[in-house]
Design a protein with these regions (language model features):
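Alpha-helical transmembrane segments of multi-pass small-molecule/ion transporters
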Residues: 5-334
């Protein structure tokens, strides 16, 4: 499986979009059309890596640039300049945190019924709760424009620290029970570039200071570069060879990500009264495939890194179908 398969998914999304144009459902059309360029960029990244058009050493450095500079710039500029009036920010944060904790708790409670090793469980867990930022931000921007960037930043401010805490706790419990350190956990959260960008962006928004006019275009330009480069990196990181070896764990993780997490988000939206674009954005982010950075955490903290690579590749491919289906089937209920 390679770039050709991803291109077939692009064709599927495009054909579905044309068909649904005849039906007239504006939201379905908008979502599918937003996903087509995302899928094409991922396919291009996979093709560039497979054909060795660019040196393999480029991709890790590009991921580092995106994670520490470009994506934080996007969130910082988006939050600092966005009009958040009328957006139920606190309710949206509550929905995202509650749904994430619900699914995480469910997976831990039923861990023994999965009949997998402790390292394998940590990979299944990451696949169930982590999300691919680049796909989410691109889809949100395609659906809601500049407001989508602000909603994406709010989603990150809620999910990123929650997921980091949960994943570190799970690794500490199942892989390294003697190595857990609250100090290290707090350092990870405080120095996370995405969390820091959201914090300072919200600070400038709340205080009304804004970004100084001389440097605002700098952050805007850096942010605009984050999405295409990030999606190319997602494609370059795909490794389908590992997916064939662990079909059952891959399916368990995908079930948690594409079924349990969206359903938990729907329940949280209904319980807390979140509606409209904020509810759809919350549902969108909780139906995303897992993050490629999950592989790095699995390798560094004693998880099953090969299995994690298979989960990442499989979910990214499955998302071409499962992601829009999950969002569109449940969006009418929020």
């Amino acid at each position: 499986v390679g770039p050709e398969t991803l291109l077939r998914y692009c064709n599927f999304l495009g054909s579905a979009g044309v068909f649904l144009c005849a039906i007239g459902n504006e939201m379905i059309i908008t979502l599918l059309l937003a996903l087509v360029p995302i899928a094409l960029l991922i396919a291009l990244g996979a093709a560039l890596r497979r054909r060795e058009f660019i040196a393999a050493s480029f991709w890790p450095q590009a991921e580092r640039l995106g994670y520490y500079i470009l994506l934080p710039s996007l969130f910082f500029h988006g939050l600092a300049t966005a009009n958040l009036d009328g957006l139920p920010v606190l309710t949206m944060v509550g929905v995202l945190v509650l749904s994430t904790v619900m699914v995480a708790g469910f997976m831990v409670v039923f861990r023994h019924r999965l009949s997998v090793s402790a390292p394998a469980f940590t990979s299944i867990f990451q696949g169930g709760v982590r999300f691919n930022n680049y796909v989410g931000v691109s889809a949100a921007a395609g659906l809601f424009g500049s407001k989508g960037i602000a909603l994406a930043a709010v989603a990150n401010a809620a999910i990123v620290p929650t997921v980091n805490v949960l994943c570190v706790l799970v690794f500490a419990r199942y892989c390294n029970p003697g190595l857990f350190s609250m100090r290290k956990l707090m350092q990870q959260l405080v120095f996370n570039p995405l969390i820091a960008a959201c914090f300072f962006g919200i600070l400038l928004q709340v205080t009304g200071w804004g970004i100084p006019g001389a440097i605002a275009p700098l952050f805007k330009a850096l942010g605009q570069a984050s999405l295409p480069l990030g999606l190319l990196c997602v494609g370059a990181a795909l490794d389908f060879s590992a997916a064939r070896k662990w079909l059952r764990p891959v399916m368990l993780s995908s079930l948690a990500k594409f079924v349990l997490m969206p359903l938990a988000t729907l329940l949280a939206c209904r319980a807390l009264g979140l509606q409209g674009q904020a509810a759809i954005a919350a549902l969108l982010f909780q139906a995303l495939p897992t993050a490629s950075s999950s592989y790095i955490m699995a390798r560094q903290l004693g998880g099953d890194a090969p299995l994690m690579a298979g989960i990442i590749a499989s979910q990214t491919l499955l998302a071409g179908f499962a992601f829009p289906v999950a969002v569109l089937c449940l969006a009418g209920w929020v």
